[in-house]
Amino acid sequence: MPERPGGDGAFQGGGSFDDSRTRLLPVVAPRAGYAPPRRLGAPPPQPRRIARLAERVPLASVYLLIVTITLFQRFVVPGTVVSVALPVAFVVLVGLAARGQLKADVTRVALYLAAVAASLLCTVVVSAGSGPAPSFTSLLLLLVLYIPLCFRVKDRLRDQFPRVLEFYQRIMLVGAVFCVLQTAIQLAGVGYEDLFDTYLPPTLIFTEYNTTYPIYYGSPILKANGFVFLEPSFASQFLAIAFIVQLMLDGKRWGRLALFGAALLATVSGTGIALLGVGLVVLAIRRGGRWTARAITATFVVAVAVSLTPVGALLAERTGESSTSGSSGNARFVAPYVVIADAIGRDESVFLVGRGAGTVDSDVGFFNPQGLLVNYPALPKFIGEYGVPTALVFLAFILTVLLRNVPSPTLGLMAATVYFVLSGSLLQPQTVYLCWLLTGLFAAARAGEVAGRRVRLSSAVEPPQWRSPAPPP
């Protein structure tokens, strides 16, 4: 028998090789539906479709919250004054936890529990006094509302932050079209009717907000709220965030920027313009001189064009209104701090323990005896109800959520501006959860991970591949 290559008739893999003792076995195709035997105790295999669906659950739950705080922000839990965003936020927590993509942030949990303990202590002290009874409903809402902010996603899902931003952009495109359409039909002479107020029972929607009002006193044209936003100011702030996010994405899509800008002007709201200015300044600082020069040039051209329109004249008239008592700017940026400072001056116990949950709004005779128009931002309202020491603990908790190891410092500073300055956000789930989505939900565990695993917003155009978490140092 001739030798096979490899020398001395030996098989290269070891041992002798004998043709006479080998034979070919027939090739048999596996039976249809055949599954390999499963080891004892091993989990049953999942169909591919179910596996793919399970992978989408975490992002789908986040998308649900985005839709709720934008297109459904006017809806309440039936029979209450609580936004539907509150229960949906807990659905998000369940969806993330079910796929193992949720993690409690130790620092946030500690600060939250400290704020809860201090708030309860202040409430007990105030309840024992002779002042008005605190609202335990308001206290309970405060404690429950901020529970989700103690959590963040794990690194595997954190890499999907660009996709979350892109989904937010698409939803806000709908809101922008609604704002432009709402203004266009009024300019065409068609009377505007709020279909929510007309056809929905008041037990399903908020009725306490100024949903629509004229662009100036006596005007037949109403400011645009996009039909679905609580107020024009809400619409303008959400649109300003969308505008800045679009600048941060690769592939600017100038049509989107134009639409967001037009919708922002249709709201005729100064808070959105102010928030847009904050975002542009932060981007200018972070991106350097060349980008800043282009941004200044573009801003100047747009400002000149807007100044030639009626909207420009209306916005110009509002630039100095913060010094005018009774104006919207004064009620938001000046009056709250004057009112709370005056209350502390008349009763020193307000500085230490506050007046009690909900009393800033209910005890008007004490806090606002002059009857000023006041729109309380989060911090002065919290000080008036729980005192300065507790407010400092709560402030540390919120700043940790909004600014610590967040995926985008620009969005973090914008979220802080919305929360602390531009809105009465303390008990507003829509605002609180928007800020959390843009910052703390996708924050890194440590500062080193932010630098080492920086989320690239350019990948929002093409969804990134899932990556394994970086090994611990």
Where are these regions (language model features)?
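N-terminal signal-anchor transmembrane segment
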Residues: A29, A35-Q101, A117-V126, M414-L422, ...
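Alpha-helical transmembrane segments of multi-pass inner-membrane proteins
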Residues: E166-G189, Y213-T267, A274-I285
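A membrane-periplasm/extracellular boundary helix in multi-pass inner-membrane enzymes
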Residues: A184-Q186, A284-T324, A343-R346
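Hydrophobic transmembrane alpha-helices and their immediate junctions
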Residues: A293-A295, F382-F420
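Long extracytoplasmic/lumenal interhelical loops at the membrane interface
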Residues: L314-Y386
